[in-house]
Amino acid sequence: MKGIRGISQLSTRLYSAQAARKLDVAAEHVKFQPQDVQVTKLPSGLVIASLDNYSPASRIGVFVKAGCRYESPDNQGVTHLLRLAANLTTKGASAFRICRGVEAVGGSLGVTSSRENMIYSVDCLRDHIDTVMEYLINVTTAPEFRPWEVSDLTSRVKMDRALAAQSPQMGVIEGLHGAAYKNTLSNSLYCPDYMVGHVDADHMHNFIQNNFTSARMALVGLGVDHDVLKQVGEQFLNIRSGMGTAGTKAQYRGGEVRVQNGSSLVHSAVVSEGAAVGTDEVMAFSVLQHVLGVGPHIKRGSNSTSKLIQGVAKATADPFDASAFNVNYSDSGLFGVYTISQSAAAGDVIKAAIGQVKAVASGVSEADLTRAKTQLKAEYLMSLESSEGLLDAMGSQALTRGAYHSPEVIAQMIDSVSATDVANAANKFVSGKKSMASSGNLVKTPFVDEI
């Protein structure tokens, strides 16, 4: 658009008889002072977080503690449909108006979800915040879920399931959670087959009513004034007060799931219970993950510095891949190794990868510890360079802690992790009850009790 305006102004200038004005080269440039993230918690429990980064583009998100872990046996898959229902008719705007209204200002509206949270976000030019904010508030607070519109989502649910089925990694990770937990976190991100076509408008309304309450929400903005965001929260996101339905604490049990198919590659994940968000050991597990290796840091690189790659390479001459797996939730976590190998070498690869974790449990060198900390800090800081990554970091912390830790504080927390902390984290994996998920030709793949 900038280029188009420039051309328009140029054509006007060509037909003008007036002399062009001289630029005042001595005029001072406007200097913007760097801003810090501002966080406010309203009496209703709603958290407002914002950062005015002076960007011409703004990004606003509503974070809700309403992931699939809060589904019950009666409404399994409801969060999957909510992801697809963001553009359906609301009490304040039709589906057509939402679609065309956001499109008309060059904005975008999207929904993502995890096992913990649902995130509704909008992007737009700074001048159109009011317009897209109206649609964001409508979608999150006043959905109608007309039965015929909900019914039309069935084909999209089936498509999502079919696309997910084509990803071995997705199948293994979903199966791993189902095997590892007795409840809550065992729920899938996708609607189970037996519920496809059976999640109706009543299920969706009840889930919204019980989980989309002020105390379970955070309104987060980039490139927006904090007072404006606070006013929006006070006026429009306080319609449902209270804590909503109390979530059940996750119960780790350990288990195994095996999916036998004709693939020549075996995907396998072996984990123990890890660290929950907010605990002292969560940072130690993150450093341990980078000590072991999380993938190449150079495009098309060999990842030769990874301890997992080094260890497994001694056990097989076949192609393989191995990385540390680490995921953290509000009350639990999973830590272990994820391997991809030829079916004939699966057993050797898995056992060699676990052997590397055992080696770290015996001690880690200062050089490896320093390298892992540097990689972790770089990964975190680079994730904040995109508006999406920064908004996610702000929203996740606001929803979990009601506050925001600056990158400097996070870096200090990483630096404070000692070699003993990392060894203790590795020992927790080694001694913990294992969970395992595998897919492929599993003839040579060991069972969880054999490793």
Regions found by a protein language model. Give the residues of each.
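N- or domain-start disorder-to-order transition segments that initiate the globular core
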Residues: I4-S58
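Divalent metal-dependent phosphate-bond-processing catalytic cores, especially two-metal-ion Mg2+/Mn2+ enzymes
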Residues: R300-N303
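Acidic/polar N-terminal loop/beta-strand segments that form early-domain functional surfaces
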Residues: L51-N53, F63-G67, T112, D123, ...
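Active/ligand-binding-proximal structured segments within catalytic/core domains
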Residues: G45, D52-V102, L176, D280-G293
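Short solvent-exposed loop/turn micro-motifs enriched in small/polar/acidic residues
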Residues: K31-Q33, A250-R253
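Charge-rich, well-structured scaffold segments of protease-associated domains
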Residues: K2-R21, K41, L88, A95-Y252, ...
